[in-house]
């Protein structure tokens, strides 16, 4: 099967693009960690299609996945989409635009950085335009199949010419010693120390000597609760320095 000639293709020479964010926190944190991804050259469709439009283009009653596979087409990787968006080759659509990458809820830890699709296990990465206020869609995860999503197409090239080896992956997770020191310092300076300072100026005489276990536990609770809103940002992982 050949590619439908009515699809307008945009050529991109590839390049290095940053994916993910560094801000941490259960509610307000970014999907991260932020890292550079080296994207090889590709061609992406100028239009985002619905599943119904894809079937009409090829005039076949075949599952979309099979249509794309036999036509040597696929959804764009996050790196390809991000690079095309940054270079203003593509613009907004209504609703959600799906990408080919599948990653766990915990983020990009352990994922390749050479431009290949991330996955294969996890949730599908999306760009959600519905809440965009500045013209930039939100990164998100598609937790279940959604027939209303749209997607662009990328022309496949022989993968052996581009992707080999392990994909130069990110670390599998945050460095444990650094995390332990970070949590200890946050507990002391954000939770425990302020609790003792408050007690020193406001509690009755002798309260600190009698109630210090409660002050420590209260400080630890404050520290743990703060993780909902904030944790120190991770530095961006550069292509030449991902083990920092």
Where are these regions (language model features)?
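A short glycine-rich, aromatic-capped structural motif
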Residues: 2-62, 226-243
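Hydrophobic alpha-helical transmembrane segments
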Residues: 205-219
């Amino acid at each position: 099967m050949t590619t439908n000639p009515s699809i307008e293709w945009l050529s991109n020479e590839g390049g290095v693009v940053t994916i993910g964010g560094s801000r941490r926190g259960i509610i307000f944190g970014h999907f991260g960690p932020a890292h550079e991804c080296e994207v090889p050259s590709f061609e992406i469709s100028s239009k985002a299609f619905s599943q119904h439009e894809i079937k009409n283009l090829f005039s076949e009653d075949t599952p979309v996945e099979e249509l794309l596979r036999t036509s040597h087409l696929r959804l764009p990787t996050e790196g390809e989409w991000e690079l095309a968006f940054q270079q203003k080759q593509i613009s907004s659509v209504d609703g959600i635009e799906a990408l080919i990458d599948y990653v766990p809820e915990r983020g990009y830890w352990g994922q390749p950085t050479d431009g290949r699709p991330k996955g294969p296990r996890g949730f599908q990465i999306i760009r959600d335009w519905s809440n965009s206020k500045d013209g930039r869609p939100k990164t998100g995860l598609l937790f279940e199949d959604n027939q209303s999503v749209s997607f662009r197409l990328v022309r496949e090239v022989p993968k052996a010419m581009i992707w080999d080896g392990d994909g130069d992956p990110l670390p599998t997770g945050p460095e444990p010693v650094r995390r332990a020191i970070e949590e200890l310092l946050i507990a002391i300076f954000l939770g425990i120390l302020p609790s003792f300072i408050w007690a020193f100026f406001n509690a009755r005489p002798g309260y600190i000597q009698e109630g210090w276990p409660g002050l420590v536990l209260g400080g630890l609770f404050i520290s743990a609760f703060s993780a909902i809103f904030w944790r120190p940002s991770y530095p961006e992982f550069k292509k030449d320095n991902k083990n920092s």
